[in-house]
Amino acid sequence: MVRKIAIYGKGGIGKSTTTQNTASAMAHFHNQRVMIHGCDPKADSTRMILGGKMQTTMMDTLREEGEEACMDLDNVMSTGFKDIKCVESGGPEPGVGCAGRGVITAITIMEHMKVYDDNDFVFFDVLGDVVCGGFAMPIRDGKAEEIYIVASGEMMALYAANNLCKGMVKYAEQSGVRLGGIICNSRNVDGEKELLEEFCKRIGTQMIHFVPRDNIVQKAEFNKRTVVDFDAECSQAHEYSELARKIIENDNFVIPDPMTMDELEEMVVSYGLMD
């Protein structure tokens, strides 16, 4: 039975990097069949899996060749490192239309063709901290059953994570979606791990893994590869392997209890981040 996971978080927090490295570790170390469906108009959710290749998006194919062309997987799906399948929703031309509609259209086509069913895990890498419209589709319509939020010990990252939890609460009962935990993508902020653990405790979830900051992530990206592909023996590759293992074995799924803005600020102040 395929497990569908949506990765959310503040813009620039490292969602795409975390998703691709975790997917690579899942396939390489844990022999899972993995697919990544990028839900960002930038279409950069699968680039490192494909060795730097920017693949043709579903919306580009739809615009240029029509819906029938989207039904041909050779046009819209690529296979990369460890046979990870890659699809990018894409979006409209800049300044025209709604990118969220592209997500809805792309997911609907993939479901119609039953593409997701041939995998153990499908990751939806979703644009920024947006919880409205098409970008909320994985939450709103139960397209993903599990949500993981990438955060750090910075105020805006926590603010975005808390807002995402508010969006989840709104749709959780109707869609069945649940929060699997917070992934800390460390920024080396003082007291970061303790702050994230406190935040998780307050909203009723777990910090599923603390991913330390390591320059090898940027080095691998510069070489257009994931860390696992670049150097599977390095310590950071094993951090992603641990994160992958914890996701595979996770059975702690909750409807979160978001904090008020006052509570969030009070907590952050107590850790000295707003001094």
Swiss-Prot record:
Molecular function via GO: 4 iron, 4 sulfur cluster binding; ATP binding; metal ion binding; nitrogenase activity
Residues engaged in binding [4Fe-4S] cluster: 98, 132
Keyword field contains Transmembrane: no
Catalysed reactions, as listed in the record: N2 + 8 reduced [2Fe-2S]-[ferredoxin] + 16 ATP + 16 H2O = H2 + 8 oxidized [2Fe-2S]-[ferredoxin] + 2 NH4(+) + 16 ADP + 16 phosphate + 6 H(+)
One Pfam family from the record: Fer4_NifH
Classification via PROSITE patterns: NIFH_FRXC_1 (PS00746), NIFH_FRXC_2 (PS00692), NIFH_FRXC_3 (PS51026)
Cofactor list: [4Fe-4S] cluster
Residues the entry annotates as binding ATP: 9-16
Modified positions (ADP-ribosylarginine) in chain numbering: 101
EC number in record: 1.18.6.1
Processing and modification events after translation: The reversible ADP-ribosylation of Arg-101 inactivates the nitrogenase reductase and regulates nitrogenase activity.
Keywords: 4Fe-4S, ADP-ribosylation, ATP-binding, Iron, Iron-sulfur, Metal-binding, Nitrogen fixation, Nucleotide-binding, Oxidoreductase
InterPro entries: NifH/chlL_CS, NifH/frxC, Nitrogenase_Fe_NifH, P-loop_NTPase
One GO process term, biological-process aspect: nitrogen fixation
Record bears the keyword ATP-binding: yes
Cofactor binding comment, as recorded: Binds 1 [4Fe-4S] cluster per dimer.
Complex formation: Homodimer.
Family: Belongs to the NifH/BchL/ChlL family.
Protein purpose: The key enzymatic reactions in nitrogen fixation are catalyzed by the nitrogenase complex, which has 2 components: the iron protein and the molybdenum-iron protein.
Protein name per Swiss-Prot or TrEMBL: Nitrogenase iron protein 1
Protein source organism: Methanobacterium ivanovii
